[in-house]
Amino acid sequence: QYFTMVEENFQFKRSEMHQIEGFPSEDVNSSGQGGLLDIKRHPNYINNGWIYTCFSKKNDSSDMSTLALARFQLNEYNIADIEIIFETSSLSTRDGHFGSRISFDSEYLYLSIGEGSPSIGGPTTPYDNAQNLNNEWGKIHRIYDDGTTPQSNPIFNENSPTSLFSIGHRNPQGLTYNPYLNEIALKYNKNLNK
């Protein structure tokens, strides 16, 4: 039995406290609210060995970032088979509101992404990323565990990313799946945000 932890400087470690090598920390933009944002084991980790992480990813030409979701496996104390399976198509020009949590249900992977503050176009851009159906910012995305998109996802408009599942999120810092919550009503004091 092992557990994986991440230190502030993006060093992965296992329960025996050995350093894990191989994560491309030079690709992580850790300014502001950026950095390594979440890490989750696949629900079937015991059989497939996949670990998922999301992070603000540096851009080659500037200090702007995309939001990336990667998966990898561990080979003793080395990261193996790392691959980016999802990445925003546009850059955030601010270093905040990345959001970013990972959750699984029995079939899909869900990824929350913050609206990135007043990004895309700079600080004078209106705060509309969460409502903008043509980008990935400020949304919950539903994908398969290999990064492909289910055909059953909602279609918001013809230019919307196919991964969109829910829109209008400012900076989601939590995301969980509750298979037993099937009834939402004020009289039962239930809430989707539990």
Predicted regions and their residues:
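Extracytoplasmic, non-cytosolic globular domains
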Residues: 135-144, 163-192
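Conserved loop/turn at the beginning of each blade in beta-propeller domains
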Residues: 32-33, 94-96, 133, 158, ...
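Second-shell loop/turn segments in exported
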Residues: 24-29, 124-130, 161-162
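Beta-propeller blade signature
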Residues: 65-78, 125-146
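Short helix/loop segment immediately N-terminal to the Walker
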Residues: 124, 149-160
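Acidic, Gly/Ser/Thr-rich repeat motifs that build Ca2+-stabilized beta-propeller blades
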Residues: 1-120, 174-194
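A structural motif
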Residues: 106-113, 137, 143-151
